[in-house]
Amino acid sequence: MIFREVLRPPIWVLAFIYFLFLSVVLSVWAAFDNQATLITLALSTMATVWIAHAMKSEITFDGHILRIDQANIEVQYLTNVRVLDKSEMRLLRTRDADPAAYLAIKFWEPQGVRIDLSDPRDKTPYWLITSKRGEEIAALLNR
């Protein structure tokens, strides 16, 4: 494995989700008994742990194949890799987005990488990837 990056949700996102669950727990406590409240609290805690796991994203590159979560592409189909700053990423996520593009973006991370593709079997023009280590990905893929 040449490159591996795991993007996990920040603690403030998980805390916000958990506080939403706690409002449900409080409502259950007001309407029912303590046993129902404890069950709801346990389920809410387990749901938050599951959500934290489900929200993570993994980028790997082994020298031949770039994998982002379930998507993968061979390096021979990559044409141009460009690191995007905060403002470029914001525009490409919204106004300038191509509906056919593959988006592997996380709202809590403002920077990323645009990877242009040239696969004749695939109409996807580019991948837009959220990454904290965009410079490193670009250096590896532009070789």
Task: Say what each PLM segment does.
Residues 1-31:
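N-terminal membrane-targeting/pre-transmembrane regions
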Residues 5-7, 117, 131:
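Pocket-edge structural micro-motifs
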Residues 7, 63-65, 119:
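Short, well-ordered turn and helix-capping elements at secondary-structure junctions
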Residues 21, 41-44:
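Alpha-helical transmembrane segments of integral membrane proteins
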Residues 32-41:
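Short, aromatic-rich membrane-interface segments at the entry and exit
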Residues 43-82:
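Conserved beta-hairpin
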Residues 69-128:
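Non-transmembrane, membrane-adjacent beta-strand/coil modules in membrane-associated proteins
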Residues 124-143:
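C-terminal/domain-terminus segments
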